[in-house]
């Protein structure tokens, strides 16, 4: 009898087809997030679970799933999963790093450039017919933004995505600063990056890109005190997690001019709506789509499948998060 895997949202077919060769596969068929009560019913007889970052996978889920041996998160982040509890129970947890690195780094630059050059404002001005109504072909003061080439970028979090952001910054002739829990000498040499304390990075940077995982240490690390350290002409880009930034402090900074603007792809709660924040013209907003390219999504689906197939074959999954779990239980169903 094949082990059973439940997938909480439809992922690209390439991953599903790979899984069907080894597993009995069930996919939640709806576009909306799976309701909690439905998830708890579905996991009762599954051996493996493929989850999205929107699902909370905790003791309640583990209690409802006595056969569960592995959770494959369709994301690079895994703060939606109680990894410590999973490890205690001998449940393997995997994620999807690397395959979405370039797409996410590209999107950080999309937000940075769109905010710096006021692209959304200009788009609305053109699309709404206001340009035509004004009857002026060109004006020297319309939508003045900020130069990017040759400026200083500060990257908070210098893992795969942070370093990919830095590689792109080299093409813009930028000075690259970074803050990380530990220094990265090889990356410094390759990218010409300079290590700074978080406070010094915020003071010196024209653009600050957040690319850290959400942990106890990074939660609300960008607060009012630190926002006040930034230049008044600086732009903040968050592609990390919403709770890395204190939203109330950020709104105050944007409204009172402590910083020039922000580009956000992530929020404290998702889905998210904040009329006060969303009414501000100096913020560019996206609904958590940093890795949303066809190539990245298909790569993530393939990696999910590879992790589950490896586990089924008694092998340690390629991107195992909780490596210490192998001491609790050997891979395999």
Swiss-Prot record:
Provide the GO MF annotations for this entry: glyoxylate reductase (NADH) activity; glyoxylate reductase (NADPH) activity; hydroxypyruvate reductase [NAD(P)H] activity; NAD binding
Q: What is its main location?
A: cytoplasm
Q: Where in the cell is it found?
A: Cytoplasm
Q: What GO cellular component is one of the record's annotations?
A: cytosol
User: Which InterPro entries does the record associate with it?
Assistant: D-isomer_2-hydroxyacid_DH, D-isomer_2_OHA_DH_cat_dom, D-isomer_DH_CS, D-isomer_DH_CS1, D-isomer_DH_NAD-bd, Glyoxylate_reductase_GyaR, NAD(P)-bd_dom_sf
Q: Provide the alphabetized UniProt keywords.
A: Cytoplasm, NAD, Oxidoreductase
Catalytic activity as recorded in UniProt = glycolate + NAD(+) = glyoxylate + NADH + H(+)
Enumerate the CDD domains for this protein: GDH (cd05301)
- What SUPFAM superfamilies is this protein classified in? Formate/glycerate dehydrogenase catalytic domain-like (SSF52283), NAD(P)-binding Rossmann-fold domains (SSF51735)
Q: Where does NADP(+) bind?
A: 158-161, 180-182, 239-241, 288-290
Q: What is its EC number?
A: 1.1.1.26
* Record has NAD as a keyword: yes
Q: Which NCBIfam families does this entry report, sorted A to Z?
A: PRK13243.1
**Quaternary organization:** Homodimer.
Homology family = Belongs to the D-isomer specific 2-hydroxyacid dehydrogenase family. GyaR subfamily.
Q: List, alphabetically, the HAMAP family matched.
A: GyaR
Can you name this protein? Glyoxylate reductase
Instruction: Provide the species name.
Output: Thermococcus kodakarensis (strain ATCC BAA-918 / JCM 12380 / KOD1)
